[in-house]
Amino acid sequence: MAYYMTNGEFQAHMKDYYQRTGNRLQFPEMTEYLYNKGFLYDSIPAPDLTDDYDSMSDEEFEKVVDSLPLSLTLYDGAPLAPTVEEADLIPNARDVFVIRHPRYTRPNLHRHNYFEINYVSRGKGTFIF
């Protein structure tokens, strides 16, 4: 069964968990944590979309991205696979897919069976390759 939460809510929980515990979780681990705490929804939250993307400020665009729903499946507790499969992240029949990577995740050495491009739209980051 799929569960749901907005991108912004997921990120807020990642940040809160890190600030409270000093520990970073991987995406599947945080999904399990949120499920156990009762924070996930059974239905998809409606995104806050607008038609005027050409003249949006960065803050307005971030608000739209924060409102986008995530479809989450529960983590079974097994060791995280060393390969992130395309089917685990990219919807069927999509050649290009864009996500905002959540902050405060634990670095985890892995590989993909797809091509990934990282882009920092604001601030700075450290890319570990």
Task: Report each predicted region and the residues it spans.
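Short acidic-glycine-tyrosine-enriched beta hairpin
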Residues: 129
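Generic protein-terminus/edge-of-domain signal
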Residues: 1-126
